[in-house]
C-alpha cells in the first residue's frame, strides 16, 4: 500500500504559502505506509521539528488495479472517501525548498498521514462537491470544498496512473485548502465530511 498526495491543489492555500506560480500539472509526492495514523490513535509530535502543521484533506481509497487510466473511467477505481490530515514539518519543508531537496522527510515521517473512517462514495451525490472541515479543541480552524480543487479527483488519478500503477488499498490525499496552521501537545483534532465526524484524535 502506498500513499499518494497532491500539493498546491487549492488556490487560496497556495497564496497563503506564497506560491504564485500556476502549475499546469498536479504536484505529486508520496508517503510510505508507515505514515498511516488511524483508529483514533494519538499523534506524537516528533523531536526533529518545532513547527508541525495540520493540513486537512479529502482522502480517496483506491479499490482496483489500474495503469494508464482514462479520466472518464477514473471514478471506477475508488470506492470510499474520508477526511485526513497531512501533517507537515513546515520548518523542514522551508529548509528543503531553499536547498532544492525533495519533501519526503518533512511530509512522509511516521504517523504523518492521519485518516478517519471511510464512507462509501455512493453515500454522496457528488464527491467533487463535498464540504470538509477541521476543529481543534472544538473551534473550527479549516474548511474547504472539493469543488475548489485546481485538479479534480478523476484527473489526478488518471495523471498519476501514467507513472505509477495504482493498487487496491492505495490512498490518495487530494490537497488542502486555505487555513493550515500549527498543532501543539494536548490539542484534540476532529475532522468532518459533510458535517459527519469521521476523524477524532489527540496531539501528544
What kind of region is each of these model predictions?
Residues 176:
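Switch II (G3) loop of P-loop NTPases
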Residues 1-171, 179-204:
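Catalytic-core "active-site belt" of small-molecule-metabolizing enzymes
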Amino acid at each position: 500500500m502506498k500513499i499518494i498526495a497532491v500539493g498546491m491543489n487549492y488556490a487560496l492555500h497556495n497564496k497563503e504559502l506564497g506560491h504564485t506560480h500556476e502549475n499546469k500539472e498536479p504536484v505529486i509526492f508520496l508517503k510510505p505506509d508507515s505514515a498511516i495514523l488511524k483508529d483514533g490513535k494519538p499523534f506524537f509530535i516528533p523531536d526533529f521539528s518545532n513547527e508541525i502543521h495540520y493540513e486537512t484533506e479529502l482522502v480517496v481509497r483506491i479499490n482496483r488495479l489500474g495503469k494508464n487510466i482514462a479520466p472518464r473511467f477514473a471514478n471506477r477505481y475508488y470506492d470510499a472517501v474520508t477526511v485526513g490530515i497531512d501533517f507537515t514539518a513546515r520548518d523542514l519543508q522551508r529548509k528543503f525548498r531553499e536547498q532544492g531537496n525533495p519533501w519526503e522527510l518533512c511530509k512522509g515521517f511516521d504517523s504523518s498521514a492521519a485518516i478517519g473512517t471511510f464512507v462509501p462514495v455512493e453515500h454522496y451525490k457528488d464527491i467533487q462537491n463535498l464540504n470538509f472541515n477541521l476543529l481543534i479543541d472544538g473551534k473550527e480552524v479549516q474548511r474547504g470544498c472539493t469543488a475548489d480543487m485546481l485538479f479534480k479527483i478523476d484527473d489526478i488519478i488518471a495523471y498519476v496512473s501514467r507513472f505509477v500503477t495504482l493498487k487496491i488499498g492505495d490512498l490518495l490525499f487530494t490537497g488542502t485548502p486555505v487555513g493550515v496552521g500549527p498543532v501543539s501537545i494536548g490539542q484534540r483534532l476532529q475532522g468532518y465530511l459533510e458535517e459527519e465526524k469521521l476523524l477524532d484524535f489527540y496531539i501528544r
